[in-house]
Amino acid sequence: MALPILLDCDPGHDDAIAIVLALASPELDVKAITSSAGNQTPEKTLRNVLRMLTLLNRTDIPVAGGAVKPLMRDLIIADNVHGESGLDGPALPEPTFAPQNCTAVELMAKTLRESAEPVTIVSTGPQTNVALLLNSHPELHSKIARIVIMGGAMGIGNWTPAAEFNIYVDPEAAEIVFQSGIPVVMAGLDVTHKAQIHVEDTERFRAIGNPVSTIVAELLDFFLEYHKDEKWGFVGAPLHDPCTIAWLLKPELFTTVERWVGVETQGKYTQGMTVVDYYYLTGNKPNATVMVDVDRQGFVDLLAERLKFYA
């Protein structure tokens, strides 16, 4: 039986590819998709969800827009990475359907209530919507199987020296998620920076030759440009968000550890840092499964295999 999931995202090139991977995978039943502000403004990320589902001919999936800003802070966006639209590069279709007439939290709550079994929430943007759901609907916590997030890092950040972008945007929300008591799976930079797509991988996807694989290749063409900056030391572009979906599909591709994670919300230099108690120094019980390594070739092969679904 397919695993029911609820996808909360802020597309974003890698979010878009996570949507492509999820909807190409019969093991997953995508119940709804909600958008969060992050990689671009809330209006643009919502539009990008609708554009991607129009491309994939999945306008049957309910969509709702989420919070317009973080819980306690002004919004920061990553337009320097994802461009003016949030999905610069390919020519994507205009949406042919409208979002639901409700908020992201309302759609999430409805989805959880109506599901016969607990739902896995996959969150690939800032954690604002998920935190609002957890705070406003404590009675639904038991309907959440786990929360799989792309965010954080055990080591170095990518937005500040200490913080990864998604967590930095709304650290208070991320702290609510980690301390919720619900199982959390964290795909942080420690693993996503190893899940790099090289130029030859992009050409492999392009050669599959269907409209979706072509769009994915064009998304990667654009995404690679930002990551060519020599400061990163990358061979390709780290495909952060699809690691969440890939872990659900093939957990054997990933090495994980069970650790306690907290989020720094006050630090002068470390605001938004995910503090991972790697050596069990705090005495706190682990609250997260933290991904630390990935079989890069296996990850690329999975993407290539699933892109053939769209032939």
Swiss-Prot record:
Transmembrane segments: none annotated. Pfam families: IU_nuc_hydro. The active site is at 240. InterPro entries: I/U_nuclsd_hydro_CS, Inosine/uridine_hydrolase_dom, IUNH, Pyrim_hydro_RihA, Ribo_hydro-like. Coiled coil: none annotated. NCBIfam families: PRK10443.1. Hydrolyzes with equal efficiency cytidine or uridine to ribose and cytosine or uracil, respectively. This is Pyrimidine-specific ribonucleoside hydrolase RihA. It comes from Escherichia fergusonii (strain ATCC 35469 / DSM 13698 / CCUG 18766 / IAM 14443 / JCM 21226 / LMG 7866 / NBRC 102419 / NCTC 12128 / CDC 0568-73). The lineage of its organism: Bacteria, Pseudomonadati, Pseudomonadota, Gammaproteobacteria, Enterobacterales.
